[in-house]
Regions:
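Juxtamembrane/disordered regions of integral membrane proteins
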Residues: 1-143
Length: 143
């Protein structure tokens, strides 16, 4: 449980930083929606899901896939209430789950859940392999 929480909060922290950077860029760029920034921010969030899995897989290298998937999903789950608070505080005409430009759409939430689980598993698998290799190297070396 501890590796999953560690990875989830690592990923959520990175997503928070990416979102703050995105908000700053949104204020600085005149036509944010038609620029390349939304794609860049989305890719950075995908990397954060991978880092969530990596953070969990480093601590629990024996079960990287389940640990990484749960850490990635946890990062997304921790971020959702924060995003709702941001929506509530901002003076914005967008609906939370309805309207033409809703903050959360069913498709968007589903895609993020799939990416969070998959990239969390990839990150944990990479970290787990690295840790197992390091541990095997330590046990094979003469003391």
């Amino acid at each position: 449980m501890r590796p999953v929480l560690r990875g989830a909060f690592l990923g959520a922290g990175l997503i928070f930083l990416v979102s703050v950077a995105g908000a700053l860029v949104d204020r600085a760029v005149d036509d944010f929606d038609d620029s390349g920034w939304p794609v860049t921010i989305f890719l950075a969030i995908l990397v954060a899901y991978g880092f969530a899995g990596w953070g969990a897989g480093r601590v629990a290298p024996t079960s990287p896939l389940s640990t990484g998937a749960l850490a990635g999903l946890g990062a997304f789950s921790v971020w959702v209430p924060v995003r709702v608070l941001i929506w509530a505080v901002r003076d914005d005409s967008r609906g939370l789950v309805s309207g033409d430009d809703a903050v959360f759409t069913l498709g968007g939430v589903f895609v993020n859940l799939v990416f969070a689980a998959a990239l969390g598993m990839v990150g944990a698998l990479l970290a787990g392999r690295r840790e197992r290799g390091r541990l095997a190297g330590e046990s094979a070396s003469p003391s």
